[in-house]
Amino acid sequence: MFFEIALIGTTASGKTYIANTLAREFDAVVLSLDSLCVYKEINIASAKPSQDDLASIKYFGVNLLSVNEHFNVELFIREYQKAKEFALARNLPLIIVGGTGFYLKTMIDGLSEKTLESKSSLNNDEIYTLLLNIDPNYKIEKNDTYRLKKWLGIYEQTREIPSEFLKRTQKTGVLKDIEIYELSWDKEILKKRIQTRTKEMLDNGLLDEAKILFSKFDHKLKALNSIGLKECKEYLDGEISFKELENLITIHTTQLAKRQRTFNKKFQSKALEFDKALAILRMKFSIEK
């Protein structure tokens, strides 16, 4: 029987493990909402599902683009529509999973009218200062270059307060009344999980993946400045030691987890402790099916 749920949580919270386990047991379709898993060439830095997982589970939202190709949330909306059509036609459950909460939020709330990203030479600090003066209710992290440029683009092209423009032009979302489950962890335990995952990524060839990526593509590309790869670039350039590389990836990933936890408060979700999550969701899937 078709039904859909969203599974959210911070990086290293075990979302993919839970989703894959349920997908295998209940023949579910999985839509990944991850800003790095879309890239064909990034496998370790993205913590992408394994080749075995991708071969045995019907996945959408993975391995869609090359690193030098640009995408936005509309890509995930199209992938959702494909995934839902596939699941509906076969009467299968659909699991939406991923750490990029912004994409899920947009799919629920709807897109606003298109505007171009600003080509201004202003840096993040300058745009952020402008935002605080003009549109203090619009919440963007100071280091979120894409959304800051998008905000400035709206202001430049419309001369409206961007938060008001977005509200006025917003369209209906594609996701309605979806149950959202959030995996929860004690902060210190999650930090240890992040440390362990960082070590595993390095042991599994993260540096080799980074070398190949930086030899083939412009290091200024957004995807190559993601956590895990930007630190590898510093190490490969001789700017930091291997120990510093491991520590920096862990620190930056922990900071990301904190931002994700804050963003996820925007959702009306049901908190699930990781150790109990699988049993609770198995029961739900059994009842729905």
Curated annotation (Swiss-Prot):
The keyword ATP-binding applies. It catalyses: adenosine(37) in tRNA + dimethylallyl diphosphate = N(6)-dimethylallyladenosine(37) in tRNA + diphosphate. Residues 34-37 are annotated as: Interaction with substrate tRNA. It comes from the Bacteria. GO terms for biological process: tRNA modification. ATP binds at G9, T10, T11, A12, S13, G14, K15, T16. Its EC number is 2.5.1.75. Substrate binds at T11, A12, S13, G14, K15, T16. One of its GO terms (molecular function) is tRNA dimethylallyltransferase activity. Keywords: ATP-binding, Magnesium, Nucleotide-binding, Transferase, tRNA processing. It is an enzyme of class 2 (transferase). Its cofactor is Mg(2+). The record marks T100 as: Interaction with substrate tRNA. Catalyzes the transfer of a dimethylallyl group onto the adenine at position 37 in tRNAs that read codons beginning with uridine, leading to the formation of N6-(dimethylallyl)adenosine (i(6)A). Belongs to the IPP transferase family. Monomer. HAMAP family: IPP_trans. PANTHER family: TRNA DIMETHYLALLYLTRANSFERASE (PTHR11088:SF60). NCBIfam families: miaA (TIGR00174). This is tRNA dimethylallyltransferase. It comes from Campylobacter jejuni subsp. jejuni serotype O:23/36 (strain 81-176). The lineage of its organism: Bacteria, Pseudomonadati, Campylobacterota, Epsilonproteobacteria, Campylobacterales.
